[in-house]
């Protein structure tokens, strides 16, 4: 079968076959109007930290502009624990993010270590900066020191830092790193040793950009950007419109991912896992950025404008307002461009903590390359804004929190007849991309 025939077959199998179901919660503080049977939903795993390598706490210079994100207990839906499908009927499938695994992935060589991380209690990958620690805490400490970041605690500076909650407060996590013996000078000495090796081995963000070109990331964004000049106000229920837009965008999301540098070089099973883990945040980031031009609402890929008042009437006003204030408004305020959006979405895509991932180390390295390329881009493109890179990263915890909250409202059933989402993603990834 040639490429065009393969695409036609795939499109025919998908047309009219995507059905969605969902349950919308009521206003905050009230039980949802409809309780779906979620006994057989697949479950997102725990929301412990390390998801982006830093937590939702803000730097002191921006602490007044960021809003608290709910902790793991607040964001976890009680009905979304690991299920066992009933034998009487096919299980309903929730496209919930696979999320971080109970034990974040480490390089295979470290799996047999008997040490645990002194900071969060996770499995240690070795001794880093004087202390046995995991890759997540090691990376967090290194970034904090190298970028000379300053954090603020929203509570009383004694937050619990463990494997599940290490990402909740950056301030307390950093202080625990210091109290357990991590040495700032060890990070600085490490960087100096690298520089002394010579120009060919100097750590370089421009080198990272060569391997993770932002130009290619921008091309991926532009390739799937809906070409819509005018938007019309939605007439139907906003939830229905959002579901239909998500339905449509799930297909383009796969094509977007295949254009991100090195994604298709990963094992096919890992590609499925990464898309399944991040689909909701990736879609939310996309329509939030598209909505920068909207007034008091969001713009969907289907060409519809969903107004804030409609969302409140439908009972989803609280989460809708969070999207507008924590994502859309912040993106508008800093004039986030599409290259920056693409890089943030690539950070979400390359999630080394996704459950079941085999190429953990490779995915971690790809995420680090995206960070480095984004930092280099912001320094070059916006030299008058030295804090822009950090400001961009502060949108990630909000995106994560909102993504989890949305899953408490929207439950998507199986797609394409009886095929589960993993099968759908596998077919999309195996199918050659259409030529452009």
From Swiss-Prot:
Q: Where is the composition biased (Basic and acidic residues)?
A: 188-200
Keyword Transcription regulation on entry: yes
Family matches, as SUPFAM superfamilies: Glucocorticoid receptor-like (DNA-binding domain) (SSF57716), Nuclear receptor ligand-binding domain (SSF48508)
Q: Name the DNA-binding stretches.
A: 114-189
A Pfam family that the UniProt record links to this protein: zf-C4
Q: Cross-referenced CDD domains, in alphabetical order?
A: NR_DBD_RXR, NR_LBD_RXR_like
| Tissue and organ expression note | Expressed in the adult central nervous system where it is detected in neurons of all central ganglia, the neuropil and nerve bundles radiating from the brain (at protein level).
Domain description: Composed of three domains: a modulating N-terminal domain, a DNA-binding domain and a C-terminal ligand-binding domain.
- State its role: Ligand-dependent transcription factor probably involved in the retinoic acid response pathway. Binds 9-cis-retinoic acid. Involved in embryo development, in particular eye and shell formation. May play a role in growth cone steering.
Protein name from the UniProt record: Retinoic acid receptor RXR
Q: What is the lineage of its organism?
A: Eukaryota, Metazoa, Spiralia, Lophotrochozoa, Mollusca
